[in-house]
Design a protein with these regions (language model features):
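Structural recognition of the beta-strand scaffold that forms the well-ordered cores
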Residues: 173-179, 208-214, 250-255, 285-290, ...
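Aromatic-lined carbohydrate-recognition surfaces of secreted/lumenal glycan-active proteins
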Residues: 249-265, 315-332
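Bacterial N-terminal signal peptides
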Residues: 13-24
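Carbohydrate-binding surface patches
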Residues: 403-406, 411-413, 449-488
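Central antiparallel beta-sheet cores of small beta-barrel/beta-sandwich binding domains
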Residues: 30-138
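C-terminal beta-strand-rich structural cap/linker in extracellular carbohydrate-active enzymes
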Residues: 505-526
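Aromatic-lined carbohydrate-binding/catalytic grooves of carbohydrate-active enzymes
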Residues: 181-183, 191-299
Length: 526
């Protein structure tokens, strides 16, 4: 081979070497990128034809890991993130104070798949994942920068304030049933029909329970014209409403003024009038409207105007629809709830099926609110937990009695298809229900407190009173009330509302031994 040929060969070999190095470098870079946890990882779950996505935005820096989790509209930062080879761990802290929960995550990476498990209760992902089951996330981007869920949506300017009619509805506190406390995302058409059948036949309808309310997770997306669609759990919402109506009952739904509901389903943002007309066409009688992702789109002080948008839409829908405001008592809702057409408004955060939650909401948090309720507009301390199993029978009697004295909506939250005798005796206590449904529409107030004992009284029509003697303590105790403290004269007639027994005319006052966490409840008539 001559020198010229050798030179060409050397150049070619050098070029091939450089090319090989470039290929190796590219492969190494790809391998390095795939070996990094940095990126956006998505977990998709399907519930009733609705696809929900949870996004994990992760950034790896050596053995440190940072980022955030986007579930529906909630962006939650991760902490204590570490990487050890193909495995990473991190922690998410949810809630505050005594409601705080630490959720620990472990993730194993295999190329562009991430298998995630979690422990600690609650958390993101499907039902199994929330109890520590695995989720498989796919890498959809190598950029781990968190992106807000609604950055591309137009912003609505809150309207000027004006008064909206209450529609002449809810002249007494609404009574019925709601799916969330017991069924959560597991509610479907068959469940609702079964509940309607039971309420129509087990005495609840006759006692006044008429609303069958479907809470979150019924929603799909929107059609080409922007109309809200129900998901496959509810194949024909109008047919379901017709069925419920055929039982002499009414059907309610749930939505949010934000783009997403609390569970991450389609909200009514920028579709308020359209949704109200759709619901009316289906035959809906009640709408619970939950703030949720509206917190991302509006300032906290905008709540009054934002709820007014849906109040106007419901009143213009052509159908009487009860309007239930659910924004957890923020922004002094009791002062403006009636002016947006609200028939009831939540006064607190969510109730839990335990004594501490129920008693704190019912006794402590309602005291400053009692003057704001009245005919057509009611304080709502949340749905009832009676029959769900987290409290004793005495505690459930206290729960029901207190809600009645508060003139609260009596919305059952248990599986009414299977009522125990104890639960039935509480929910169907017509003496106590009559206190709640009294046409005067006054909310009861706390008239005495002595340590763990409290006396509450509710004015009733024709000069009568309902009086509850409550024992929040750990042991039975005697509790008394004097008629003079309530400006009751003479010897009024007294009826024991749990014993269903007339006690005749009683002078001076009334005393009873009340069990721990229990109640004695009487009706006093002049």
């Amino acid at each position: 081979m001559n020198k010229k040929a050798k030179s060409k060969a050397a150049v070619l070999l050098a070029a091939l070497g450089v090319f090989a190095l470039m290929l190796a470098a590219t492969a190494w870079a790809r391998q390095a990128a795939s070996a990094s946890f940095t990126g956006k990882w998505a977990v998709q779950t399907n519930v009733g034809s609705t696809t929900r996505e949870t996004d994990y935005f992760l950034t790896q820096n050596g053995t440190a890991l940072s980022g955030a989790i986007l579930n529906g509209y909630r962006m939650t930062n991760i902490s204590e993130g570490t990487v050890n080879g193909s495995q990473a761990t991190w922690v998410v802290v949810m809630g505050t104070g005594d409601q705080q929960r630490r959720i620990a995550y472990t993730a194993t990476m295999d190329g562009d798949e991430l298998t995630i498990t979690q422990s600690g209760g609650g958390g993101f992902g499907g039902r199994g994942a929330g109890r520590g089951g695995p989720m498989v996330a796919k890498r959809v981007s190598s950029d781990g920068t968190p992106v807000g869920p609604f950055d591309s949506l137009p912003r609505i300017t809150p309207p000027a304030l004006h008064n909206v009619s209450d529609g002449g509805m809810a002249r007494t506190p609404p009574m019925g049933w709601n799916s969330w406390n017991h069924f959560k995302a597991l509610v479907d058409d068959a469940t609702v029909r079964g509940v309607a059948d039971s309420i129509a036949s087990n005495g609840m309808k006759d006692a006044g329970y008429v609303f069958i309310n479907i809470d979150d997770t019924w929603e799909a997306g929107r059609d080409a014209n922007g109309n809200i669609q129900a998901n496959s759990k509810f194949p024909d919402m109008k047919a379901l409403a017709d069925y419920v109506h055929s039982k002499g009952l009414k059907l309610g739904l749930y939505s949010s003024p934000g783009p997403k509901t609390c569970a991450g389903y389609e909200g009514s943002y920028n579709h308020e009038a359209q949704d109200a007309k759709t619901w009316a066409s289906w035959g809906i009688d009640y709408v619970k409207y939950d703030w949720c992702s509206a917190s991302v789109m509006f300032k906290q002080g905008d709540e009054h105007a934002v709820y007014q948008i849906m109040g106007d839409a419901l009143r213009a829908s052509g159908r009487p629809i009860v309007f239930s405001l659910c924004q957890y008592g923020q922004e002094d809702v009791q002062t403006w709830g009636p002016s947006v057409g609200g028939n009831l408004w939540r006064t607190t955060g969510d109730i839990q099926d335990n004594w501490n939650s129920m008693s704190h909401i019912g006794f402590d948090l309602q005291v400053p609110l009692t003057s704001y309720a009245g005919v057509g507009h009611w304080n709502d301390p949340d749905m009832m937990e009676v029959g769900n199993g987290g409290m004793t029978n005495d505690e459930y009697k206290t729960h029901f009695s207190l809600w009645a004295i508060l003139a609260a909506p009596l919305i059952a939250g248990n599986d009414v298809r299977n009522l125990s005798d104890d639960t039935k005796s509480i929910l169907l206590n017509k003496d106590v229900i009559a206190v709640d449904q009294d046409p005067m529409g006054a909310e009861g107030t706390r008239v005495a407190k002595n340590g763990d004992t409290e006396v509450w009284a509710k004015p009733l029509a024709r000069g009568a009173y309902a009086i509850g003697l409550f024992n929040r303590g750990a042991s039975a105790t005697d509790i008394s009330v004097k008629w003079s403290d309530l400006k009751i004269n003479g010897k009024p007639k007294v009826r024991d509302l749990w014993a269903h027994k007339d006690l005749g005319k009683v002078a001076d006052g009334y005393s009873a031994q009340v069990p721990s966490h229990g109640v004695a409840m009487i009706r006093v008539e002049p």
